[in-house]
Amino acid sequence: MCRYEHTIAITNRTLVQGDFLEQMKKVIHLHPHAVILREKDLPDDAYSALAEKILSLCEREGVRCFLHSRVLIARNLGCRRIHLSIPALETMSEAERFELQRNFEEISVSCHSLEDVNIAVKNGATQIILGTIFETDCKKGLKGKGIGFVEAICKTCPIPVYAIGGINLERLPQVRKAGAAGGCMMSGFMQLVKN
């Protein structure tokens, strides 16, 4: 059993010391459940070039890769997995949501409440990224919603839930016990030093 099989690696190249692609090779080689290529600050052309490389690395290792919000880039690159925010999903027309479900086999959605989860599920989400569970350096001062929140959502959610926010390998068993399929890690993967 892989130590990282219940984790999703969320990218943030600004946290990486050294070469981002080399770091991603290490991360992908660990076989997490998936990678979400975040990099929200990149312009489309740079994101597309990076996505092509990450998709290739993931494909070679048999790891799922979700592109973050860039629906057209994902379609152009033949990527059938997309990650969206609730606001992005809600602002889509009915026709756009239909196309989304037609063009993507997996749709991941960030949620912060039961209402968000219901919207995501109704609109074809296949997995939920639920946060923020524990306080984290990425969102200093934002109090985590805790394990009880994970448990409450997982009791009613018909699709896999992955917790985010302060998740590490030590906390992973807690969120799994609460009903989550796993957890998302950003700094844990971006600052990983071993091979």
Question: Whereabouts are the PLM-identified features?
Answer:
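Active-site mouth loops of central-metabolism enzymes
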Residues: R3-L21, E105-C111
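Glycine-rich phosphate-binding active-site loops on the catalytic face of alpha/beta enzymes
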Residues: A9-R13, I82-A95, Q127-G141, I167-N195
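Histidine/lysine/aspartate-rich catalytic loop segments that bind and position anionic ligands
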Residues: I107-E135
